[in-house]
C-alpha cells in the first residue's frame, strides 16, 4: 500500500505536470447541425391562482453523432430541459420528480426565493420520490437557469444533461427582440469530450474542472444558427462545468449588451467582447442588417468558432467602496480546494446576515506558489452588485446585477450583497468539481 509520503509525492508530481488554469483545446464548430430551442413549458392554473408545473429529472438517450447514442439525463426529456417563463408577482407551484437512480435536487440558479425551496444539497429528493414547492416571484425580468445541486454529484449530473432555462419577464415595453425561438434566442453553450462518439463523464472527469474538446449549443455538436431576422437577441448561458468563455464576433462588429445575470442594465453598452464564467448569463443584441457578409461566427478567444450565424437574407478608478462585512478567501486546486481554509460541512453555518441588510463582501482568489487558477464565485438566493475589482471600478461587462463573479489568481473583489428572503443559502466556486470537493459554504439569513 502506498504510504503518505509516496502519496504526497505523487500529488506534487502531478501538480508540477500541469498548469493550474490550463485551458483544454476546444475545437471549432463545423456548422453542420442547425440548433433547436428548448420548448416552453406551459403551466396549468389551479383554483388558488398558482401557475402549476411538473419537472421530472430522468434518464435518456441522445444521438449526438449519427448512429451513436449516449446515455444522458434531462428534464422532461432526453437532454436539457424546457424553458419556464414567469413574471414578477406570479404564484408558482412546481412538482419535482426524481426518476433517476440516484439522489438529486432542483436548484433555481439566480432566483431570489426562500432558502427552503432553493434546491441546495440539503434538499435532496431520493430516487423514485417527488415533492412540490411553492413560491412567489419577487424580482425583475432576468434570464436564470435551473440545474441539480446534489453533493457531491452536481458536476456529473449537469455534464450529463440536467440544465434548463428560466425566464422572468415583465410587461415593460422596450425595443429588444422578444419572439421566442425567432429573434429572442436561448443559447446554452457547453463543452464536452466524447469517447468513441459517446458521452463518458467518468473517463473525462478532471478534479480541477472538466473541460471538453467539443462545443455544444443547445445540445447540438457542430452547431449553427440560420436566421432571416435583422436583429437577434441572444440569451447566453455558459452551461459548462469549468470553461470560461470570451465571446466576440469574428468580423469584430460591436453588439448591444443589454442584461446581466440579474436582469436588464440601467444603461445598455456597445461592446465587442464579453466574458462568461461558468454558470453566467448575459443578453446581447446583434444587428445582422449591418453585416456585409453572409455569415459571422460567434467565437471564443478570437479563434474557436462556437456558433456560425448565417444571415439568410444576405446569404479613473478609486476604491470608494464601504467597509467590508465579510471576507471570503478561495484557495486551492484539485480536491484540495477550500473557502476560508475549510471544506464544506452541511452541519456548519459559516456566516449569518439579516434579511434586507446591505453588506459588503470581499472575495479574494488567493494566489499560491504555483500562481493559482481562476475561480467563479456564486451565491444562492440573491443578486449582488460588483463594487470594485482590485480597488478599481468593475469593467463594463461586470455591471448590473449578478450572481457569479470570476476572479483571476490574486484578484480581490468587493460586492454588495442583500438577501430579500430568509433561509440557509450556499456560496461556492461554480467549477462544479471544486464545488463537489468542498469549495462551498453556508450563510443563514434571519429576520
From Swiss-Prot:
Alphabetized SUPFAM superfamilies for the sequence: Cupredoxins
GO cellular component, one term: cytoplasm
Co-factor binding comment: Binds 4 Cu cations per monomer.
Residue numbers binding Cu cation 2: 109, 147, 430
UniProt KW Metal-binding keyword: yes
Needed co-factor(s): Cu cation
Region (Disordered): 1-43
Record field: compositional bias (Basic and acidic residues): 1-25
Binding-site positions, Cu cation 1: 107, 378
Organism, as annotated: Staphylococcus aureus (strain MRSA252)
Its job: May be involved in copper homeostasis and oxidative stress response.
GO molecular function, one term: oxidoreductase activity
Chain sites annotated for binding Cu cation 4: 375, 429, 434, 439
This protein's encoding gene: mco
Residues bound to Cu cation 3: 149, 380, 428
Disulfide bond sites: none
Family to which this protein belongs: Belongs to the multicopper oxidase family.
Cellular compartment(s): Cytoplasm
Entry's EC annotation: 1.-.-.-
Keywords for this protein: Copper, Cytoplasm, Metal-binding, Oxidoreductase
Gene3D superfamilies, sorted: Cupredoxins - blue copper proteins
Domain of life: Bacteria
Keyword ATP-binding tagged: no
Name assigned to this protein: Multicopper oxidase mco
Amino acid at each position: 500500500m502506498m504510504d503518505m509520503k509516496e502519496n504526497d509525492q505523487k500529488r506534487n508530481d502531478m501538480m508540477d505536470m500541469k498548469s493550474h488554469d490550463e485551458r483544454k483545446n476546444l475545437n471549432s464548430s463545423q456548422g453542420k447541425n442547425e440548433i433547436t430551442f428548448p420548448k416552453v413549458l406551459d403551466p396549468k392554473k389551479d383554483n388558488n391562482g398558482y401557475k402549476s408545473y411538473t419537472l421530472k429529472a430522468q434518464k435518456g438517450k441522445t444521438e449526438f453523432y449519427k448512429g451513436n447514442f449516449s446515455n444522458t439525463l434531462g428534464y422532461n426529456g432526453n437532454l436539457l430541459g424546457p424553458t419556464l417563463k414567469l413574471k414578477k408577482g406570479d404564484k408558482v407551484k412546481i412538482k419535482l420528480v426524481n426518476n433517476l437512480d440516484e439522489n438529486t435536487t432542483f436548484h433555481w440558479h439566480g432566483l431570489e426565493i426562500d432558502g427552503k425551496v432553493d434546491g441546495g444539497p440539503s434538499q435532496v429528493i431520493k430516487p423514485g420520490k417527488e415533492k412540490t414547492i411553492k413560491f412567489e416571484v419577487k424580482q425583475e425580468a432576468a434570464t436564470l437557469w435551473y440545474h441539480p445541486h446534489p453533493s457531491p454529484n452536481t458536476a456529473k449530473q449537469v455534464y450529463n444533461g440536467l440544465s434548463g432555462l428560466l425566464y422572468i419577464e415583465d410587461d415593460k415595453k422596450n425595443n429588444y427582440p422578444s419572439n421566442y425561438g425567432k429573434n429572442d434566442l436561448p443559447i446554452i453553450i457547453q463543452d464536452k469530450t466524447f469517447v468513441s462518439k459517446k458521452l463518458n463523464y467518468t473517463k473525462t472527469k478532471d478534479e480541477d474542472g472538466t473541460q471538453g474538446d467539443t462545443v455544444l449549443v443547445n445540445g447540438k455538436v457542430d452547431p449553427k444558427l440560420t436566421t432571416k431576422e435583422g436583429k437577434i437577441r441572444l440569451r447566453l448561458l455558459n452551461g459548462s462545468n469549468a470553461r470560461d468563455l470570451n465571446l466576440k464576433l469574428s468580423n469584430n462588429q460591436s453588439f448591444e449588451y443589454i442584461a446581466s445575470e440579474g436582469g436588464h442594465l440601467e444603461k445598455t453598452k456597445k461592446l465587442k467582447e464579453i466574458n462568461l464564467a461558468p454558470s453566467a448569463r448575459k443578453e446581447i443584441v446583434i444587428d445582422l442588417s449591418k453585416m456585409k457578409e453572409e455569415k459571422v461566427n460567434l467565437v471564443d478567444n478570437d479563434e474557436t468558432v462556437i456558433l456560425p450565424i448565417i444571415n439568410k437574407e444576405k446569404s479613473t478608478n478609486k476604491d470608494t467602496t464601504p467597509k467590508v462585512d465579510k471576507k471570503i478567501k478561495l484557495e486551492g486546486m484539485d480536491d484540495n480546494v477550500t473557502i476560508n481554509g475549510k471544506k464544506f460541512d452541511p452541519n456548519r453555518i459559516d456566516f449569518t446576515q439579516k434579511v434586507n441588510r446591505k453588506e459588503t463582501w470581499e472575495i479574494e482568489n488567493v494566489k499560491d506558489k504555483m500562481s493559482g487558477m481562476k475561480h467563479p464565485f456564486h451565491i444562492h438566493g440573491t443578486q449582488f452588485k460588483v463594487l470594485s475589482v482590485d480597488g478599481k471600478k468593475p469593467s463594463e461587462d461586470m455591471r448590473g446585477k449578478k450572481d457569479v463573479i470570476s476572479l483571476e489568481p490574486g484578484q480581490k473583489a468587493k460586492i454588495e450583497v442583500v438577501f430579500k428572503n430568509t433561509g440557509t443559502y450556499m456560496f461556492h466556486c461554480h467549477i462544479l468539481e471544486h464545488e463537489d470537493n468542498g469549495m462551498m459554504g453556508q450563510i443563514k439569513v434571519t429576520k
